[in-house]
Every structure is written in C-alpha cells, then in structure tokens.
C-alpha cells in the first residue's frame, strides 16, 4: 500500500436513488440479504446431510453457495448502512482495502468456479461411463483449490494496483462499495498504467472463463443431440439450464461494468446490484426450484425435522 496517502477514510455515496426511498430500499435489500444467507445455508446443509448428493456436481455447488453467502456479506451490510444514516457512508482506508480485496477475491473465485462447473457438466454428459473415475475426489479438491488460489492471486493484483497509488485529496467514492474503477478516480497521480493493467487482468479472467464455459456448452449440446431418448435429452438440458441462467446473470453485468469503454457511476452502481445482490440470491433459488434431486433432499430434510419434533 502507498505510504504517501493522506486520506484515512472514504465516503461511499451509496446506491443512486431518490432520498425518500431510503427506508423501502433498506427493507428490500435486508430481506434479499437474509434470504440469500438462509438459502445458501440451506443448500450447504442439505448437501451435507444427504449422502445421495455427495457427488462432484454438488461438491462444487457447496463451494458456490459458500462463496455467494460471503460475497453478499462483503457488500450488502455496508450498503444497508449507507441507507440508514449519513455516518454509515464512512469507511476507513484499511476497511476499504479489505472490502476491495474480498470483493474481488470472492467474485473472481466464483468466476473460476463457474468454469470448473461447466467442465464437470461436460464430463458428466459426454463421458457418463468414465465420469466417476475422471472426476475423483482428489481431482475435485484440486480443481476447487485452484479456483480459490487463482481468485486470491487475481484479487491481490487488483488491490495492490489500486492502493499503491497516493490518495491525498478527494475521498468520495461514487459507489456503494469499494471497487477499483471509482477509487482510481480519486488518486493523486497518473492512473493510466494501473487502469490498463487492471483492465487487462479482468479482461483475461472474464473473457477466458467465459470462452471456456461456451466451449464446454457447445460440446455438451453436441453430446446431448447424440442421446437417443427424449427423456435423456430433457434431463441433460435441464441439468445445464440452471448453470447457464446463473452464469449469464453473473457475467453480463461484470462485462458491462469492467470491460466497456468509459464509465458512468450511476449506471455502474445500478448494474452492480445484479451480481452483488441478486445473483447470490438467484443461485439457491435456481438450484432448488429447477433441480429435482435438491428439491427431494429438501423435502426429506423437512420431513426428518418434523418427525424428530413430533417424537
């Protein structure tokens, strides 16, 4: 971190909205946050207690639910504070560093994890007989660990490039969280090189992951079309549809914010809601409502709890 920074705290402007909407927005985002945490905790619990879900697909889903739960926790509580009172908009310099790091750490790890999950679906559908041996427990653990380590490295680059610059004057961040683009606008130095490296870094991660996901699904579609039974094709498509929905809801807003020329603070703040608030909620909804195995496990857990309480 830069030793020449004079700024000790930043002010988050919060989500762009009319002043009279503070209370309604606070209520809405609080409900969404609680549902996000409870929904992802439910998925973690269901997969943990149901032995039928101890498969590679659900192993990666537990990682995704864990990430989403904390990804939402890194961003939403502070956003709620900005809606409660003006003092809630203040964030210390070091807290801002921490939020930026964990925001990119969890976000990029999720990006890498989506890529691994698409590869897992490709192997399951294209090589059903060899799938178990190809996705062994050790390989699953290696792939999951790689996503976390890659996310950590990516986040370290973003954080160092952002806060290595001096901040000696303006301290108002035009966002509801500490993110690199709005923070760099406050630096008391030339940021062109930093912005270029950050742009290339995010571009390589986002475009690389998305390209691999697209290639996986092109191969999956080709494999599905070779399935002779309509029931088999329907089940394969249903399995992949959930993943496709979540991937699109995550990648499209990210690409819009980080990889388009120019930046509009108001538009970026609104679009960021999709992947910081809605996507973590969408994951448990999509994977429970569209997944028969998860729904069956949830009902089984409910019956088990009801039976234990009735005794």
From Swiss-Prot:
Instruction: From the record, give the cysteines joined by S-S bonds.
Output: 96-188
Q: Which InterPro entries match?
A: GPCR_Rhodpsn (IPR000276), GPCR_Rhodpsn_7TM (IPR017452), Olfact_rcpt (IPR000725)
Localization per record: Cell membrane
Molecular-function annotations in GO: G protein-coupled receptor activity; olfactory receptor activity
Membrane topology per the record?
A: Multi-pass membrane protein
Q: Which residues lie on this side of the membrane: Extracellular?
A: 1-23, 74-98, 160-196, 258-268
**Is Cell membrane a UniProt keyword of this protein?**
yes
Residue spans crossing the bilayer:
24-44, 53-73, 99-119, 139-159, 197-216, 237-257, 269-289
* Gene Ontology cellular component annotations, sorted alphabetically: plasma membrane
Among the GO biological process terms of this entry, one is: detection of chemical stimulus involved in sensory perception of smell
The residue spans the entry assigns to the Cytoplasmic side of the membrane are as follows 45-52, 120-138, 217-236, 290-311
Record keywords, A-Z: Cell membrane, Disulfide bond, G-protein coupled receptor, Membrane, Olfaction, Receptor, Sensory transduction, Transducer, Transmembrane, Transmembrane helix
Role summary: Odorant receptor.
The similarity comment for this entry is:
Belongs to the G-protein coupled receptor 1 family.
Q: What is this protein called?
A: Olfactory receptor 10G9
Q: From which organism does this entry originate?
A: Homo sapiens
């Amino acid at each position: 971190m830069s030793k020449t920074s004079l700024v000790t705290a930043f002010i988050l402007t919060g989500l762009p909205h009319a002043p009279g909407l503070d209370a309604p927005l606070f209520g809405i985002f609080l409900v969404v946050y609680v549902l996000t945490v409870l929904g992802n905790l439910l998925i973690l619990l269901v997969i943990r207690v149901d032995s039928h879900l101890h498969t590679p697909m659900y192993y990666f889903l537990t990682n995704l639910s864990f990430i989403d739960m904390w990804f939402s926790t890194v961003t939403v509580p502070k956003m709620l504070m900005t809606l409660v009172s003006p003092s809630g908009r203040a964030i210390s310099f070091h807290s801002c560093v921490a939020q930026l790091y964990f925001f990119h750490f969890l976000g990029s790890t999720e990006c890498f994890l989506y890529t691994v999950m698409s590869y897992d679906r490709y192997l399951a559908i294209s090589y059903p007989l060899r799938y178990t041996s190809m996705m062994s427990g050790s390989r699953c653990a290696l792939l999951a660990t790689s996503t976390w380590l890659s996310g950590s490295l990516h986040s370290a680059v973003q954080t160092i490039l952002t806060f290595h610059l001096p901040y000696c004057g303006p301290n108002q961040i035009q966002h509801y969280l500490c993110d690199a683009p709005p923070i760099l606008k406050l630096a008391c130095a030339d940021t062109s090189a930093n912005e270029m490296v950050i742009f290339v870094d995010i571009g390589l991660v986002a475009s690389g992951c998305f390209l691999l996901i697209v290639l996986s699904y092109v191969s999956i579609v080709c494999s599905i079309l070779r399935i002779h039974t309509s029931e088999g094709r329907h089940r394969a498509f249903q399995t992949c549809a959930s993943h496709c929905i979540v991937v699109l809801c995550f990648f499209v807003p990210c690409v819009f914010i980080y990889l388009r020329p120019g930046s509009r603070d108001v538009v970026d703040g609104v679009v960021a809601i999709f992947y910081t608030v809605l996507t973590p909620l969408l994951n448990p909804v999509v994977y429970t409502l569209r997944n028969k195995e998860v729904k069956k496990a949830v009902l089984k857990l409910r019956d088990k709890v009801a039976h234990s309480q009735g005794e």
